[in-house]
Amino acid sequence: MNPREHGKRSIDNETRSALKRQRPAVIWLTGLSGAGKSTIASALELALFEQKKHTFLLDGDDLRLGLCRNLGYSDEDRTENIRRIAEVAKILLEAGLIVIVATISPFSRDRRLSRELIGIEHFIEVFVDTPLSECERRDPKGLYRKARSGKIENFTGIDSIYETPAQPNITIDTLSEDPDLAVKRIISYLETNQPA
């Protein structure tokens, strides 16, 4: 086998995973802006790091500053944003990492396509369920206020839809669960529901 042929690798995914002594996965946190995705994702990354797991966090806000900086907020651009994130997550998964994705990803079809691209057996969808009213109350970046005043158009939850996941692997109710409990639940799911 020529390792330079497209799609051919001299080290397979299973070998990479064995070296890292972990099962790779993509933990995809979805929810409204201000729901708590980044907070939970950061706490999860730290908890897994403390368990000596090899992880990488892909935060939608950070990716908008680099990889996706040429995209706006039209439905088409949002779809392309999620496609790019899913492609990067898949590459990191194939490197044997536990990938944590924190992004609004408002459309169910984009989350479905991401799941299919990454592989159903490796994709853990976490719905960070926070009511719009609570997200607006938190509004850490002042985005809801700007959207309500017309300074931001096509803002998810205000004038652009968020399609609630129909069957997420995990639902986190941030009104009743703090980030530490959310992290424990995600790690428990990761330990008991991932293929060997």
UniProtKB/Swiss-Prot annotation:
InterPro entries attached to this UniProt entry: APS_kinase, P-loop_NTPase, Sulf_AdTrans/APS_kinase
Active site per the UniProt annotation: 105
Pathways involved: Sulfur metabolism; hydrogen sulfide biosynthesis; sulfite from sulfate: step 2/3
Alphabetized GO MF terms: adenylylsulfate kinase activity; ATP binding
CDD domains assigned to the protein according to its UniProt record, in alphabetical order: APSK
Keyword vocabulary terms for this entry: ATP-binding, Kinase, Nucleotide-binding, Phosphoprotein, Transferase
Purpose of the protein: Catalyzes the synthesis of activated sulfate.
Name of protein: Adenylyl-sulfate kinase
